[in-house]
Amino acid sequence: MQKKLFLLDAMALIYRAYYGLIRNPRLTSAGRNTNAQFGFTSTLIDLIKKENPTHMAVAFDTHAPTERHTTFVDYKANREDAPEDLLDAIPDIKRIITGFNIPCIELDGYEADDVIGTLAWQAAAAGYTVYMVTPDKDYGQLVKENVFIYKPPYMGSKEEILGPKEVCEKWQIKDVHQVIDILGLMGDAVDNIPGIPGVGEKTAMKLLAQYDSIENVLANADKIGGKMGEKIKAGADSAILSKQLATIITDVPVTFHEEDFCIRDHNKDALSENWNSKPWVNVSWATRLVPVAKLLPQARYNWTSLATPPLRLLSLHRKIILSKR
């Protein structure tokens, strides 16, 4: 059997679910908006039933600052506060994930992107085919022979699977490593990454087609000349900073132990207890699931927080250890 690991970017999928149903919200009898719970759970079940993963995990962001915030204080500073309904959904969603016996991983000082990137490359090196489940374009820098982006269906669209070929075609680049150069030049409004003012996506792709990297673009600013050459000179520091901010870390202190990520039979009692009290989902969804490793023993996971020495300029770093109970 092919070993397939699916790594879910929790917050990206939760936001997507919440706003994807915003015009037709899933409300409880008390008027509570449960778009996020409904949408995320639907995506999770569809993945398990349709894609037949052998291994799975869900990565969450934390509220702790990261090295990116230390490097650039305005990193993600343009984001509005999340709606209260969305924030209230997170504990529900974590309980659902736990009911499926799927590990949740979060690590202070790092974003979910970094955790997923690290685990994806480790698992690929161990012979797994890895799917990073996210709508975020940043993940394009991580794809390789056995590592793909998996964009779930959204508002009527079909799922989209992107490998190196698809990522390079999308950005008109020669190698996926150039994704961070694209983002460094054009910036990323979602994360408040500045890029070079006046350089958009088309210009960034044109510059990289000729010069291959941000460093070479900056080195040839005089040759480029004109107003664009002046913009490049003026924005040189911003470009280098932006490339650094856009780079996903792949040496996070987490380890892929395949036995901890196995798909196991769901905990029907736990799901029933949780879902019977929630009008936004039908417990029959759980009974229709046919887990890949149905004969494996069920597992429970404890979340243990450990204080560790300073890491990458951070004063505090908490590591979530998955341990069978």
Residues of each region from the PLM?
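Short glycine-rich phosphate-binding loop at a beta-alpha junction
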Residues: 54-60, 103-106, 129-133, 283-286
